[in-house]
Every structure is written in C-alpha cells, then in structure tokens.
Amino acid sequence: MNLTTRRTEGTTWKDIAAQVAAGSLKVGDQIEDELLTGEKMVYEVAHITEDRMDFISRDTMAERFTWNENGRNTGGFKKSDLCKALNEKVWEQLLPEELKAVICERECIQVVDGEEEKIMLKLWLPSEYEVFGEEWFSDAKEGEQLEIFKDPRNRIKMGGHGGSRARWWLLSVNGGYSTYACHVNGNGYASNNGCAIDFRVPLCFSIKR
C-alpha cells in the first residue's frame, strides 16, 4: 500500500525531506500540496537513487506550454522556452518557498544531433527513454527508465486536478527533425509534435537523500 501525505502546517516539506534522507518513502508514495495559485497538486515518488529521490506530479499543471515558440528544437531542452518557463516563471511564481528550499538540482541528459549533454536543473521533465525505456522518436537513450513508468498506467496524466486525459511534453527532441519534440499522448503512448504546439507538463523535481 502506498503512503499519501497531505502537506499541512503539521507536515512540512522539511519533514518530507527528512523522510527522503531516512529512506522512509517508496516509489508510488504521494504528497498532496498546493501551488501559490491554490491549484492542487499530488506529487508521486517516481524514482530513487543513492543520492536523490525524484518526484513527478500525478497529473499535469492546468496551464499549457509550448516547447519552443519559434517552432524549432535547436539547442535541445536546455535552450527551450519550456525549460525557461519551468525554471523561471513556475519556480519563481508558483512554487511555495518551503518546497523550493528542499529541491536539489538534478542531472538530466539531452541528446541533440547525436551530441550528448548533461544539464543541471531544479525543475525538469523526463526524457522519452526515462518514461518508456525505449527510443521511439528521440533516437537516443537519455538516462534510465524511471521506476514509476514501468507500469504503463502511470504514463497517463490528466490535465490539471480533475481534468481529462492530457498530452504532456517530454525533455527529448525528435531525432532527425528540427521542428519536433517528444511527448506522451492521452493514451500514455509515445508521440511527437511541433515545438510550437501547446501541451501540458507535470511538475518534476528532486530532493537530496
């Protein structure tokens, strides 16, 4: 049975970080909280390594985002409007200070035109390989499959709290195409689309163990 914890005045993110450090949480455990806008979020433990615990929201945020407004994937996720939006707008305007205080940077791998680059991010998205354990459109093994996504049902996300099935962006570019990036469709399958399209995104962050 998975644990569900509601973040309240009596259960702080500092307390949750202590549980992470102690190894008390397991993949699938949930933390309920709200953004500064009042939007409800449920964060799930998605993967555990020796040095960190990855959390990914059960469903996406309500807001939609383009991967890149100019319609191109040049420079990969690191240079994308989406990466900037997550690590500037979302980080600065939507996340509670208490949560930001316990988030650590995570090393993410992006491959663009055959060139691998490691980038450090506080808010990130999983790569296609991290979700599916296969390269469908990215043509690149970026990282390892996250434990929570080994169950295909967990690849399906709703658009906002209580919304309908959503298409959600991934970190990966579409291999061989300069205007496409990878996403997960409403049925939880690998897909691709133009970078200027607006899809939803989950909130993804890590806490140091």
Stretches with model-predicted labels:
Residues M1-R209:
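Collagenous Gly-X-Y triple-helix signature in extracellular proteins
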